[in-house]
Regions:
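Tandem repeat scaffolds
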Residues: 3-8, 13-22, 42-49, 65, ...
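Hydrophobic membrane-insertion alpha-helices, especially the h-region
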Residues: 26-42
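Alpha-helical transmembrane signal-anchor/signal-peptide segments
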Residues: 47-58
C-alpha cells in the first residue's frame, strides 16, 4: 500500500504530540502530589491552639491521674464555652476539682474518683455516673441533669440544691446528709436510696420511685411527694418537717407532725451532723479533705499533741 506524503506527515506529527501530552500529564500529577504533601505538612506543623491543647489535656485524664495543667485547661474550655458533648472520662480522678459551668451532655463518667468535685451549673443531660462512682461531698448546685444516671453512686453529703434532674436514675445511691432542696427530680428513680439526714426542703419529688428508700430524719418541708411510687405511711412517718410548711402527699397518706428541730440550737445540731457526714464521706476516701481545689492529707489526731492536729475548715456554705 502506498502512503502519501500528507499521511506520513500526520503520523510523524502525532508522535511528539503524544510524548508532549504525556509529559504534561506527568508534570500535573507531580505538582498535585507536591501541593497535597505541602498542605499536609503545613497542617501538621500548625501550632496547636490553646483550646485544642486544653481539650486534649482534659481527655487525657481518662482512667488515670489528672495532668498538672488540668485546672488551666478546664478554665480555658469554660471561658470559650466550648461544649464537650459525649466526652468519655471514665475512671478519671477528679477529687476536689472544679468542673463547674461546663457543657458535658451525654458525658461518660463511669467509675470516676470524684470526691469533693464541683459540677455546679454544668449541663449533664444524659450523663453516666453509674457503677459505684465516688462522689461523696460533691456539688451539683444549679446543674441540669435530666435523664442522668447515678445508680450505685456514693454521694454522702453532696449538694444538689436547685438541681434539675428529671427522670434521672439514683437507684441504690447513698445520699446520706445530702441537700436536694429546691430541686426538681420529677419522675426520677430513688429506689433503695439512703436519704438519712438529707434535706428535701421545697423539692419536687412528684412521680418519683421511692421503693425501699430510707427516709429517716429527712427534712421534707414543703416537698411535693404526690403520686410517688413505693412511699408508704411507715416511711413517711420517719421524715420530719417544719409545722408551718408540711409536705404535699397523695391520699391515703397522712401527715403526722414531726419537727426536724424546735429551736435554733437543735437546728445547729442538725447542720453539724450533716457536715460531719460530709467530712466522713471525704475522709473515708481521701484520708483528708478538700480545700481550694486540692486534697489536704489529714493524719489521725494525736491526743497527747493537740497542737499537731489539723483542723478541717467549715465555710458558711457548710453550716
Amino acid at each position: 500500500k502506498r502512503i502519501t506524503i500528507n499521511e506520513a506527515r500526520k503520523v510523524v506529527y502525532k508522535i511528539p504530540n503524544k510524548i508532549f501530552y504525556k509529559k504534561i500529564k506527568s508534570s500535573l500529577v507531580a505538582v498535585s502530589i507536591i501541593v497535597i504533601l505541602s498542605f499536609l505538612a503545613f497542617y501538621n506543623l500548625k501550632p496547636e491552639s490553646l483550646l485544642e491543647r486544653s481539650i486534649r489535656i482534659l481527655k487525657s485524664a481518662k482512667d488515670t491521674s489528672i495532668p498538672p495543667e488540668f485546672d488551666e485547661a478546664v478554665s480555658a474550655i469554660r471561658n470559650n464555652k466550648f461544649p464537650l458533648d459525649n466526652i468519655d472520662l471514665s475512671g478519671a480522678n477528679f477529687q476536689c476539682k472544679d468542673l463547674s459551668s461546663l457543657t458535658l451532655r451525654r458525658g461518660i463518667f463511669i467509675g470516676i474518683r470524684g470526691t469533693g468535685v464541683n459540677f455546679d451549673s454544668s449541663n449533664l443531660y444524659l450523663a453516666q455516673f453509674g457503677r459505684f462512682s465516688e462522689l461523696n461531698a460533691s456539688s451539683f448546685k444549679n446543674a441540669l441533669m435530666d435523664e442522668s444516671n447515678f445508680e450505685n453512686a456514693n454521694m454522702i453529703g453532696s449538694s444538689l440544691n436547685n438541681t434539675i434532674a428529671r427522670s434521672a436514675n439514683f437507684k441504690n445511691a447513698t445520699l446520706n446528709g445530702a441537700n436536694l432542696s429546691n430541686g426538681d427530680f420529677t419522675s426520677s428513680d430513688f429506689s433503695k436510696v439512703n436519704f438519712t439526714q438529707a434535706e428535701l426542703n421545697s423539692t419536687n419529688m412528684r412521680y418519683t420511685i421511692l421503693t425501699e428508700a430510707n427516709l429517716q430524719d429527712v427534712n421534707v418541708s414543703n416537698a411535693d411527694l404526690r403520686d410517688t411510687i413505693g412511699l408508704d405511711q411507715k416511711m413517711l412517718d420517719k421524715t420530719c418537717f417544719s409545722p408551718k410548711n408540711p409536705p404535699i402527699v397523695s391520699a391515703p397518706l397522712i401527715i403526722n407532725a414531726r419537727s426536724c428541730y424546735n429551736n435554733e440550737s437543735k437546728h445547729k445540731e442538725r447542720q453539724i451532723m450533716q457536715h460531719a457526714l460530709k467530712v466522713v464521706g471525704m475522709m473515708s476516701i481521701l484520708n483528708g479533705f478538700c480545700d481550694k481545689g486540692k486534697v489536704i492529707n489529714r493524719p489521725p489526731d494525736i491526743p497527747s499533741r493537740p497542737d499537731l492536729n489539723i483542723e478541717i475548715p467549715i465555710s458558711s456554705n457548710d453550716i
